[in-house]
């Protein structure tokens, strides 16, 4: 199981929001590049970067910051936020980003996700952000009538690297991961899942470990590692202890 440190960028700095609300923001670092290097130094194998301005503006808004992060670290970076067309996907992947995350566009224009998966095999992730089980879009400002599991199953045959599943009610709240909803998604779909939202302590990491055999690829942690309720090194050590130090395949489809 991979532990992804989250770097959320707003107005060029590293922040965390509560439940995606731009009015409930805490700044955790004025230099996202330094933050990225910190997590790499602590042993991170991946970075999860979100362009929050991009999510709200519907277009990438912090490309230069992301490019600087990619150049500064030697570990792979996945990026989401405001990626609505093939041009944005190409620009990110050509700049050295390993994986682009498509959320809103997957629901609004599914052909973009389909084309991207054909062009960039296993370098595309589907971002599913759910509020009470329903997919939220446009920077979480709108809640659709589409069930999260139904959306995942719709794209099951595509060459997706992963689904990044976020429980909006828990994001930034440090109230524990929604194990039940994550398990439901894993049991319904063969695409690997990265869980997000609600990590608070080491216990939350341990609670996710039984889901690894079901296809859980990793977990994203943000506020917990910035506020200090979870030490990143402790989380890594616990996963290595329980999983035997094995590194999962970047695209481990069940049944393949």
From Swiss-Prot:
It is an enzyme of class 5 (isomerase). This is 1-(5-phosphoribosyl)-5-[(5-phosphoribosylamino)methylideneamino] imidazole-4-carboxamide isomerase. CDD domains: HisA (cd04732). It catalyses: 1-(5-phospho-beta-D-ribosyl)-5-[(5-phospho-beta-D-ribosylamino)methylideneamino]imidazole-4-carboxamide = 5-[(5-phospho-1-deoxy-D-ribulos-1-ylimino)methylamino]-1-(5-phospho-beta-D-ribosyl)imidazole-4-carboxamide. Its EC number is 5.3.1.16. Belongs to the HisA/HisF family. InterPro entries: Aldolase_TIM (IPR013785), His_biosynth (IPR006062), HisA_bact_arch (IPR006063), Isoase_HisA-like (IPR044524), Isoase_HisA-like_bact (IPR023016), RibuloseP-bd_barrel (IPR011060). The keyword Transport does not apply. It comes from Syntrophobacter fumaroxidans (strain DSM 10017 / MPOB). One of its GO terms (cellular component) is cytoplasm. Its main location: cytoplasm. GO terms for molecular function: 1-(5-phosphoribosyl)-5-[(5-phosphoribosylamino)methylideneamino]imidazole-4-carboxamide isomerase activity. Pfam families: His_biosynth (PF00977). The active site is at residues 8, 129. Pathway: Amino-acid biosynthesis; L-histidine biosynthesis; L-histidine from 5-phospho-alpha-D-ribose 1-diphosphate: step 4/9. Keywords: Amino-acid biosynthesis, Cytoplasm, Histidine biosynthesis, Isomerase. It is found in: Cytoplasm. The keyword Cell division does not apply. One of its GO terms (biological process) is L-tryptophan biosynthetic process.
């Amino acid at each position: 199981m991979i532990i992804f440190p989250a770097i959320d960028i707003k107005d060029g700095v590293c922040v965390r929001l509560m439940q995606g609300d731009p009015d409930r923001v805490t700044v955790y670092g004025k230099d996202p590049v330094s933050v990225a290097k910190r997590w790499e130094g602590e042993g991170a194998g991946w970075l999860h970067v979100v362009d929050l301005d991009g999510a709200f503006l519907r277009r990438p808004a912090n490309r230069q910051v992301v490019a600087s992060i990619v150049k500064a670290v030697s570990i792979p970076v996945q990026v989401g936020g405001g990626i609505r067309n093939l041009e944005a996907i190409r620009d990110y992947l050509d700049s050295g980003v390993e994986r682009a995350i498509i959320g809103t566009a997957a629901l609004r224009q599914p052909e973009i996700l389909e084309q991207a998966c054909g062009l960039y095999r296993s370098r595309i992730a589907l971002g599913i952000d759910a509020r009470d089980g329903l997919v939220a879009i446009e920077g979480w400002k709108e809640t659709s009538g589409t069930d999260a599991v139904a959306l995942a199953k719709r794209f099951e045959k595509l060459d997706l690297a992963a689904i990044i599943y976020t429980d909006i009610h828990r994001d930034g709240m440090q109230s524990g991961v929604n194990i039940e909803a994550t398990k439901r998604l894993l049991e319904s779909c063969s695409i690997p899942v990265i869980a997000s939202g609600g990590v608070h302590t080491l216990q939350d990491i341990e609670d996710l470990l039984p889901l690894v055999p079901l296809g859980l690829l990793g977990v994203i942690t943000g506020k917990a590692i910035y506020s200090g309720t979870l030490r990143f090194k402790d989380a890594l050590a616990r996963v290595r202890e329980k999983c035997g130090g094995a590194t999962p395949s970047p695209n481990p489809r069940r049944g393949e």
